[in-house]
Amino acid sequence: MNYVQYYPTDIVNGEGTRCTLFVSGCTHACRGCYNKKSWSFCAGLPFDEKMEAQILQDLKDTRIKRQGLTLTGGDPLHPRNLAVLLPFVKRVKHECPDKDLWVWTGYTLAELKADTLQRQILPYIDVLIDGKFEQDKADPSLVWRGSANQIIYRFTQY
């Protein structure tokens, strides 16, 4: 798995101060996508042990308290990314149980639940924003969403 960007301190992609990882690879190809550079699975850098350790270190940093981790992209829940992300998310939740996990995906919750691989990550997600970006439903006034078809699911209240 590759990633195109990592923000160790982010206040845009979720509530509170967070770490945000932009994962490479997306097959949805939404018209009007703001992050087309993340569509290729080869874009960016390999997500390696060093980057994994850096994110965990940042989440544990007491000088800059982070509320949690955001995974976006690209599409972090594309099956090609889950072989790496699922063990990483489990590790984050084990080592940082007080941190929340926000995930943006082009898949709907129903699609994720129907897929045997994708549904395995759902128990670790606190907030899921689902659905492809639909340019004809775009609304800049929406919080955390680009288009009105996207739904915010809060699986846990932290």
UniProtKB/Swiss-Prot annotation:
What are the required cofactors? Answer: [4Fe-4S] cluster
Coiled coil (residue ranges): none
**Does Metal-binding show up as a keyword for this record?**
yes
Instruction: Give residues annotated as binding S-adenosyl-L-methionine.
Output: 32-34, 74
Enumerate the GO terms in the molecular function aspect: 4 iron, 4 sulfur cluster binding; [formate-C-acetyltransferase]-activating enzyme activity; metal ion binding; ribonucleoside-diphosphate reductase activity, thioredoxin disulfide as acceptor
Keywords assigned: 4Fe-4S, Cytoplasm, Iron, Iron-sulfur, Metal-binding, Oxidoreductase, S-adenosyl-L-methionine
Please state what the protein is called. Anaerobic ribonucleoside-triphosphate reductase-activating protein
Q: Which organism is it from?
A: Pasteurella multocida (strain Pm70)
